[in-house]
């Protein structure tokens, strides 16, 4: 039990590292005051540039991927891996270094699920790519990919703990997109430009 709490706390602290904020500051920009104000890859892409956006995406994804892979490598079963992944995700969204504020969690969730359920990621990624290709809204693709992920996990042979973690992650991702949802409804959401 103590080892499990250690892993969960460590994953949370790793997830709490604000990748986008730190990369933005390297370029003299506080992304919380630019664009959407979000510290995630999409805002970095739009306000700082493509390279920094991709670096942010990679860093945020690794924050979810690495602790889960390490827990797996050290012999922890899927239920503990799921809690470790949830902790890393919560660290990103509710960062201890940002007074429990943070990003929307999409890239970190991607990393978590690449480690825990890579086949399920393919299904969610297909939904994301299709919606972004047709409507050009990153937020819509992210919201719908999050929404389908628990359904995919439900129909795959995974532990109940992973399903619970997936439902919680999906719910938080969708809730964190509340302002995007309002803009989508109003027709004022920014479209993705490659």
UniProtKB/Swiss-Prot annotation:
The gene is plsY. Signal peptide: none annotated. Belongs to the PlsY family. The keyword Lipid biosynthesis applies. GO terms for cellular component: plasma membrane. This is Glycerol-3-phosphate acyltransferase. It is a multi-pass membrane protein. The keyword Glycosyltransferase does not apply. It is found in: Cell inner membrane. Its EC number is 2.3.1.275. Catalyzes the transfer of an acyl group from acyl-phosphate (acyl-PO(4)) to glycerol-3-phosphate (G3P) to form lysophosphatidic acid (LPA). This enzyme utilizes acyl-phosphate as fatty acyl donor, but not acyl-CoA or acyl-ACP. Probably interacts with PlsX. GO terms for biological process: phospholipid biosynthetic process.
């Amino acid at each position: 039990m103590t080892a499990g709490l250690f892993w969960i706390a460590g994953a949370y602290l790793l997830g709490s590292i604000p990748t986008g904020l730190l990369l933005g500051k390297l370029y003299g920009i506080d992304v919380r005051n630019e664009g959407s104000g979000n510290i995630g890859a999409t805002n970095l892409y739009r306000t700082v540039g493509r390279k920094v956006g991709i670096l942010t995406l990679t860093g945020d994804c690794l924050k979810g991927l690495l602790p889960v892979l390490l827990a797996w490598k050290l012999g922890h079963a899927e239920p503990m891996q799921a809690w470790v992944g949830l902790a890393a995700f919560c660290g990103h969204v509710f960062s201890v270094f940002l007074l429990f504020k943070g990003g929307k969690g999409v890239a970190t969730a991607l990393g978590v699920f690449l480690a825990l359920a890579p086949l399920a990621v393919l299904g969610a990624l297909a939904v994301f790519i299709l919606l972004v290709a047709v409507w050009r809204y990153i937020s819509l693709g992210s919201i719908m990919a999050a929404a389908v992920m628990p359904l995919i996990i439900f129909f795959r042979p995974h532990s109940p703990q992973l399903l619970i973690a997936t439902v919680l992650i999906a719910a938080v991702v969708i809730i964190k997109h509340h302002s995007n949802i309002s803009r989508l409804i109003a027709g004022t959401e920014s479209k993705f430009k490659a």
